[in-house]
């Protein structure tokens, strides 16, 4: 059967359209990976550029003020939020459940949070306390210990408030250059295990943080 010129043209247009769709899908996938895929090595360069652009100057200012290492803070922002601004938030259902248990008296405490801290907290407030905020993705309930407001760690003051929290909670470990412990503390609240096996959500969280630190140290 002979193919008419019109049919040939239609096949060409169909092929070209398919190629465009495939190219668009690849481009969208690549953009998403570079924005959200800070855990993929090819996207790390983009995460570093975003972190430098969005937070570099302010982090440097407050790192000097609180005597907390600049490379660590920058690496932590890249790990936790990919350098995005606004940094976004992440609700943790299991934390919400623990806080609700504390409020109802079924649990004596959750870390430093006691029932007295949650007496006036409604469900919306508990959800905010169970959500991580800002470039350092600090959990809302961490504010209670330092008498901060959630708006302090998610708004315009997020960088300063986050660095203050780090300074007061595990800043001594950073000043002693115990960076492996510091990354593990930020993510889990515990020192890096003596077994050598981290308990972070991402098994390579600490390793990536240390590697990012080296890159930021070279840029200074």
Located regions from the model:
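Catalytic glycan-binding domains that act on GlcNAc-containing polysaccharides
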Residues: 32-220
